Amino acid sequence: MQCVNVELKERRYPIYIGEGLLTDSSVYPLKSGDKVMIVTNETIAPLYLETVTDTLNQIGCQVSHVLLKDGEKYKTLGSLNQIFTALLQENHGRDTTLIALGGGVIGDVAGYAAASYQRGIKFIQIPTTLLSQVDSSVGGKTAVNHELGKNMIGAFYQPITVIIDTTTLNTLPKREVNAGLAEVIKYGAILDYPFFEWLERHIDNLVALNQQDLQYCIARCCRIKADVVARDETEKGDRALLNLGHTFGHAIETHLGYGNWLHGEAVAAGSMMAAALSEKLGNLARTDVARVEKLFARANLPTLSPDGMQPEDYLPHMMRDKKVLAGKLRLVLLKALGQAYVATDTDPALVLDAIYACTQTD
C-alpha cells in the first residue's frame, strides 16, 4: 500500500493506494458508533456495496446507503436532492460521514451534498474508476451539471480520506479504463515530462491493467495533483493548469449531451486541440504534437472532434467556461511537453483554426 498526503494550509488528508483496501478497516477514519451514509449507483452497488458495508459493520458503524442512477446525465440537482432526502428521512446530522463509492459522477455529487448538507459534513472518497482515482477524487472539486454547462453549480470541499482500491479497475469496462488514461496523459503533458516519457514506454501495460504499473501511475498522478492543490486549493493560480483540454472537452460534452462521449474521451480530443493551438502559436514543435497524438491513440482515445459537431459550435460553449475573465477566453496551452501555461487573450480566429485542424474532413 502507498500513501500520498494532500497538504493544505489548515489540514492534511491521506490518499491510500493499493489492492484489497475496501476490506482494510485500518484505512477508514471511522470508529464504533459513527453514522455513515454510502452514496453509490446502480452499477457499482452489486459489485462493492456489500463489501464496504461489511467492513464498516466490522468497525461498528451505523450504515445506510442511497442509490443513484449511473451516468453523467444524472449529475444533476435532482440526484443531489435525492441524497438530501435520504439524509433527512433517516435523521442524519452533522456527525454523519458521507462516503462516495463510485466514479467521478458519484464523487462530485456526493461531495457537493457533503459540502451543502447542514452547511458541511465529513466525507470519504472511494473512487472505483481510473479517471476518478487519478483526478476527480483528489483536491476537493465538487459539482453538478446544468443543461447550459458542465460543473456550473458546486463548491471546493475536501474529503477527509481517499481510499483507492486498484482491484476495482478489474470490473471497469475497457472504454472507461481508456477514458481514465486521458487524465493520466494530461499530467505528463502539463507538468512532468519524465512521466510523459514513462507513459510512452508503459501505456500498453496500463491499458492491459498491469497492477504494478497501475499503482505506480496512480500514485504519481495523485502526487502531482496533491502538490498543485497544496499550492492553489481554489484554482486562483497554478491549479488551472490541470484543465488542459477541458475547455474544449466540456464544449464537446455539453453540445453532444452529457454521457454521449465520456469525460476522458472529450479531454483527449480537447487536449489535441490545445496542442494544435500551442503549435500555431509557435510554442510546441510539430513532433511533440505528434507524440501526444500517438499516446492518446495507443490508449484508444479520440484525437479528432466528434462527428456532427462543427468547429463553429465550440466557441459559444467555451465562453461559458469558468476560467473566462472579462469576456475573454483563458486556455491551458503547452510551451513544451511538461510545461503548461494559461493563455489569457488568445485570438478566437486562431482557436477556431486549431479546432479545424482537429476536425475530420471527408
Swiss-Prot record:
Q: Which cofactor does it need?
A: Co(2+); Zn(2+); NAD(+)
What pathway does this protein act in? Metabolic intermediate biosynthesis; chorismate biosynthesis; chorismate from D-erythrose 4-phosphate and phosphoenolpyruvate: step 2/7
Query: What is catalyzed by this enzyme?
Result: 7-phospho-2-dehydro-3-deoxy-D-arabino-heptonate = 3-dehydroquinate + phosphate
Residues the record lists as binding NAD(+) = 70-75, 104-108, 128-129, 141, 150, 168-171
User: Could you tell me which SUPFAM superfamilies the record lists for this protein?
Assistant: Dehydroquinate synthase-like
Q: Kindly list the GO CC terms recorded for this protein.
A: cytoplasm
- How many and how are cofactors bound here? Binds 1 divalent metal cation per subunit. Can use either Co(2+) or Zn(2+).
Keyword list (alphabetical) reads: Amino-acid biosynthesis, Aromatic amino acid biosynthesis, Cobalt, Cytoplasm, Lyase, Metal-binding, NAD, Nucleotide-binding, Zinc
Cite the binding residues for Zn(2+): 183, 246, 263
Q: Where in the cell is it found?
A: Cytoplasm
Q: What is its EC number?
A: 4.2.3.4
From the UniProt record, which GO molecular function terms apply? 3-dehydroquinate synthase activity; metal ion binding; nucleotide binding
Q: Which class of enzymes does this protein belong to? A: lyase
Q: Where are the transmembrane segments?
A: none
Reported function: Catalyzes the conversion of 3-deoxy-D-arabino-heptulosonate 7-phosphate (DAHP) to dehydroquinate (DHQ).
The protein's matches in NCBIfam families, at most eight in alphabetical order, are given as:
aroB
What family name appears in the similarity comment? Belongs to the sugar phosphate cyclases superfamily. Dehydroquinate synthase family.
Its name, as the record gives it, is 3-dehydroquinate synthase
